[in-house]
Amino acid sequence: WDIRPGVNSLDKRLQNAWAKHGFEFLRRYYTMRMSISSAPTIRHIQGVEIRSIDISNPDQVALWHKLHQNSFSKHFGFAPRELEKWRELVQDSAIDPNGVFFAFKNGEPVGFCQCNDEYVEDNRGFINLLGVTLENHGTGIGEALLQTGISYCISKGYDSVELNVDTGNESGALKLYEKVGFKAESSWIQLHRPSI
């Protein structure tokens, strides 16, 4: 296994301490936030329907697992997870049971958006996961799912919505989030020790 510590981008002292042990920069991540007051216009795509799912339904969780594994399979650090491990993660997280949405294209599931209750005490929504199957990247489905997640957070009465992003994500997620109105609030970097 590989140790990959995360460090706040502003914490040069801690970064230098890790560097003394041979650790180097690997990736940068942003926490992004957007103030929300009115629901965005959800992009309509011919043949695409977005609807909430029932996370207590084992078949829908299995489908979500399949979508996740496909959507993130080319992402940095991706490691396949077996369905049972996925079910455990779903059961043990702060998932808002009404805040998981699937996109269906011509009746076939092609993407998902998952909102969390993690920051409810701060009156802030959190979009924890957003994924679109590889063959549907660049079709606008990700933007429609993101807008659905934002609208859901507005319906909960939140003042803002937050998400995290790998700035090196090859899918163009950072560009999408900026386009929709998210701004970087903080940044952290992931370090690693190169093999000798």
What are the language-model segments listed below?
Residues 75-132:
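A conserved beta-strand-loop-helix scaffold within acyl/acetyltransferase catalytic domains
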Residues 49-66:
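A short beta-loop-alpha structural element at the N-terminal edge
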Residues 1-49, 187-193:
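Acyl-donor-binding surface of acyltransferase catalytic domains
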Residues 146, 169-173, 190-195:
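Short glycine/proline-centered loop/turn elements that form peptide/ligand docking sites
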Residues 8, 133, 137, 166:
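Residue-level recognition of the GNAT/N-acetyltransferase active site
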Residues 1-9, 153-165:
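Conserved GNAT acetyl-CoA-binding A-motif
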Residues 132, 138-155, 174-179:
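Conserved acetyl-CoA-binding loop-helix of GNAT-fold acetyltransferases
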